[in-house]
Curated annotation (Swiss-Prot):
This is Acetylglutamate kinase. It comes from Burkholderia ambifaria (strain MC40-6). The lineage of its organism: Bacteria, Pseudomonadati, Pseudomonadota, Betaproteobacteria, Burkholderiales. One of its GO terms (molecular function) is acetylglutamate kinase activity. GO terms for cellular component: cytoplasm. Pathway: Amino-acid biosynthesis; L-arginine biosynthesis; N(2)-acetyl-L-ornithine from L-glutamate: step 2/4. Catalyzes the ATP-dependent phosphorylation of N-acetyl-L-glutamate.
Length: 299
């Protein structure tokens, strides 16, 4: 892993050069929306959490509109463990029975979201927390998980949903009033049930609906890796399909890369998978020329 960037050790002239390098990117993204899927170590290590909060505040201050969609898998696992319940995953998706759904809502919409909002506000930003149930933001339907061993059959994984529709009005209203939206990936269905939705899928759909200029997905690895552990810096749709087919992309990376590719195909101009373990990874990707992570292309 790259060493964290310690800005206190950078000479003033170099700091000026860094700011000058950022200027064309600030101009490019000024007034534009950037959707950030926030997760992994960046959500659990205090140094990285504080760095992320400062990053999104800086983006807002220079006229870029960050929208945060957060995960919370480790926190959900810890909460389930406390009640003696093990987490189960199928194809990267958490099996969510009624009891697990109650835990998911409490952890994501309460503990995790409020931690993010509080930290951003502590450092001088203005963040507002939402779940997909607020303002009719995320309409969900039950996810039918295809059974790979039995074509035409589906696996019931409980109250796991997929995005049926997004009403972005509440997000746009917050942006217009200079707030930073922080969204928990919980949707509501026509059946009256709450649904646990993979945060990567929500981030991709939201980026599309908001006509975002950029979608960033933070993870705990440098980006998409080949079978020899080498970083793949640029992937086309055809190359991604091949990596799905040979099993290079698997587990929790499946929904992440699928969502990233769908967003790219739907018109999001820039889609990147970035290493959230590196301090200030958001700023490095958006405001510098530094090649960073994996770029996902639709063609």
């Amino acid at each position: 892993m790259s060493e964290p960037i310690d800005l206190s050790q950078i000479a003033p002239t170099l700091k000026a050069e860094i700011l000058a390098e950022a200027l064309p990117y600030i101009r490019r993204y000024h007034g534009k929306t950037v959707v950030i899927k926030y997760g992994g170590n960046a959500m659990t290590e205090e140094r990285l959490k504080q760095g992320f909060a400062r990053d999104v505040i800086l983006l807002k201050l220079v006229g870029i509109n960050p929208v945060i969609v957060h995960g919370g898998g480790p926190q959900i696992d810890q909460a389930l463990k406390k009640i003696g319940k093990a987490g189960t995953f199928i194809q990267g998706m958490r099996v969510t029975d009624e009891e697990t759904m109650e835990v998911v809502e409490w952890v994501l919409g309460g503990e995790v979201q409020q931690d993010i909002v509080t930290l951003i506000n502590h450092f001088g930003g203005h963040a507002v927390g939402l779940t997909g149930k607020d303002g009719g933001l995320i309409h969900a339907r039950k996810l039918l998980m295809p059974d790979r061993d039995n074509p035409g059959q589906y696996i019931d994984i409980g109250q796991v949903g997929e995005v049926e529709a997004i009403n972005p009005a509440v997000v746009k209203a917050l942006q217009d009033d200079a707030f930073i939206p922080v969204i928990s990936p919980i949707g509501f269905g026509e059946d009256g049930l709450s649904y646990n939705i993979n945060a990567d899928l929500v981030a991709g759909k939201l980026a599309t609906v908001l006509n975002a200029e950029k979608l960033l997905m933070m993870t705990n690895i440098p980006g998409v890796m080949d079978k020899d552990g080498n970083l793949l810096t640029d992937l086309s749709a055809r190359e991604i399909d091949a990596l799905f087919e040979d099993g290079t992309i698997s587990g929790g990376m499946l929904p992440k890369i699928s969502s990233a590719l769908d967003a790219a195909k739907s018109g999001v101009k820039s889609v990147h998978i970035v290493d959230g373990r590196i301090e200030h990874s958001v700023l490095l990707e958006i405001l510098t020329e530094q090649p960073f992570g994996t770029m996902i292309r639709s063609h």
